[in-house]
C-alpha cells in the first residue's frame, strides 16, 4: 500500500552535488595550492586532490542511507562516514564496498563488526584504543583507525593540550595502525565568532605534537591524513581542508545557514502529499486540537495526511506554508500525529487528490519553492533537523542516477 505522503530522492542530483563539490575543491586547490602545517611533515598526506568523506550517517540525513551510499560510491566517494557500527553494517549488507569510517563512540559488544565488515573506527579515548586493540588481537589482525582530537568542542576526542600523556600507549599499540587525524569545529557556521580560528590553531599544534612523538611507519600508513572540515567549514575556509573534507548537508543540496555558497547545488529531497479532505469552517469555529486556530470569517481548509509521527514539527502551525496548485497556503491549527490542515481560502476548486508540496517546488511557468532552510528558519531550528526527522513510515522513492552510474540503481 502506497501512502499519500512520499519523500522523493533524486540520486542524479545527489551525484551532481558530489561532483560540484569535488570541482569546487579542485578549482580552489589549483588556484591556492595546498595549505601546509609547518613542522608536520610526517602528517602531510598527498597534496592533491582533496579527498571527500561523504557523510551518510542518520540514514543519510533522512534520505535513505543504502541507496544514497551506493550512488556516492558510484561517483567516487573516497570514504563514507556513519555514526556507528550498526549503520555501517546496513550499508555493507546493501552491497556498499567503499571504505566506511565510524565517526562515533564504539560499543565494546559491537567491535567484532569492525573486522567482519571491514570498517574503520575512530579512536577518541585511551579506553577505546584498548578495546579495539584487544579485539584486533583476538582476530589476529591490525586495523587502521582515525584519531580524533578534541580542540575545544568538549565532546569526543583526546584533549589537544594533553596528548603527550594520553597518546603514547595508543600510538604504540601493536594491532592499531594510525591512518588519519581529525577534529570537529563547534562554530564553523558562526562566522562572527573567533573560536573557529582557535580550534584550527589547536588542531595544527596537536599535529605538530603527534609528529614529534615519532609515529613510525610500522604503526602508521604511508600517509597520515588530516581532516577537519564539515560542510560549513568547507565553505568558510580552505585552510582547514587539509587532505580530506567531510561534506554532509552540502551533498543533499542544502547550504548550512547562515552561509552562502557559490557551488551549484540542487536539493536532493522533496516531500509531497495529497489533499484527503476539504472542509468549510464557519466564523467563530476552531480547527484541530485545542482549537488553536479560530476562523474570523468563512474559511476553507484542506486536510493533509502528514503529521508529527512523520516528522512534521508542531511549530510549523502559523509559521510555515505548503504549496498547492503553485501557490503558498499557510498551515493552520495544531499538527496532529497523522494529519495537518492548511488554509486554502480563495484557492479555487481544491479537491481531494490534489498534490501538496511540503518541501520542494511546484508550478511550471512561475514555480514556487519551499526548502528545508526556509522551514527551519521559520520555526527556529536547523535544516539538519528538518530532513533527519522525516519518519520511517514515509516511503522514499528514488529517481535515477547519472548516466553510466548504474551501481546506484540497485
Where does each model-flagged region fall?
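A broad helix-preferring feature
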Residues: 17-18, 28-31
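Short, low-complexity intrinsically disordered segments enriched in A/P/G/S/L with frequent Arg
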Residues: 32-36, 41-48, 220-222, 406-409
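Active-site anion/phosphate-binding pocket segments in diverse small-molecule metabolic enzymes
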Residues: 1-15, 19-23, 86-87, 106-108, ...
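General helical structural elements
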Residues: 32-33, 45, 152, 250, ...
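Intrinsically disordered, low-complexity segments enriched in Ser/Pro/Gly/Ala and basic residues
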Residues: 33-35, 43, 172, 213, ...
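Active-site-proximal beta-alpha core segment in soluble small-molecule metabolic enzymes
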Residues: 5-13, 23, 29, 47-214, ...
